[in-house]
């Protein structure tokens, strides 16, 4: 009897382990009141969902904790190149958010702190040239931001401002400089809360 009881316990344990290891697809998840559940579970979903493209190349890897996004989420293009990575904590972005073009060139890199932008913000063109570089502090643009043309020439430079931490709609403020695509200075002047103020100077490209 002791041997049978041991075998029975082992069998039950095997069934539980088999159920826990059974692959859950992203399409099997659903949202209820802002939390994620698996279609065959009553409690919020805990675990990682992994899926591949039909070719066998990895497509996505998402982790949930108590029904909320958690840890690093990753997506890949069907050619195997990384597409996007987002770091979550308790359902909100907290850490780095990266995205790539299909050719493998990075598209942007942003930093979040408790769901709002905080830290360096960088964007690139598909050819690898810098597009935008700036910084956030507590959800608002901080300091000088620089923008470039696809050919690598500087396009504009100045200090944007914003009063809304949930919006990326900025207002130019202070001295701003603009350049032509050939690198020659185009325009310079002062802004006050998005409105041009005082004397502005302009130059034609040669």
Question: Which stretches of residues belong to each language-model region?
Answer:
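Bacterial Sec-dependent N-terminal signal peptides
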Residues: 1-22
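Glycine/tyrosine- and acidic-biased, solvent-exposed loop/turn segments at the edges of beta-strands
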Residues: 16-206
């Amino acid at each position: 009897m002791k041997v049978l009881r041991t075998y029975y316990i082992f069998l039950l344990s095997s069934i539980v382990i088999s159920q826990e290891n059974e692959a859950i697809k992203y399409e099997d998840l659903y949202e209820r009141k802002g939390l994620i559940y698996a279609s065959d579970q009553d409690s919020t979903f805990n675990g990682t969902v992994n899926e591949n493209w039909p070719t066998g190349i990895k497509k996505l890897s998402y982790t949930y904790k108590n029904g909320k996004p958690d840890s690093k989420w990753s997506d890949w293009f069907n050619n195997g190149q990384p597409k996007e990575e987002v770091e979550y904590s308790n359902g909100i972005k907290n850490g780095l958010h990266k995205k790539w073009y299909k050719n493998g060139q990075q598209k942007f890199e942003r930093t979040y702190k408790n769901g709002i932008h905080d830290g360096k913000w960088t964007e690139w063109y598909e050819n690898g040239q810098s597009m935008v570089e700036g910084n956030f502090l507590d959800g608002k643009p901080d300091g000088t931001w620089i923008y470039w043309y696809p050919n690598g020439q500087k396009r504009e430079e100045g200090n944007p401002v914003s009063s809304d931490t949930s919006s990326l709609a900025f207002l130019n403020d202070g001295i701003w400089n603009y350049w032509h695509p050939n690198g020659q200075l185009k325009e310079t002047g002062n802004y006050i809360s998005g409105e041009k103020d005082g004397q502005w100077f302009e130059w034609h490209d040669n």
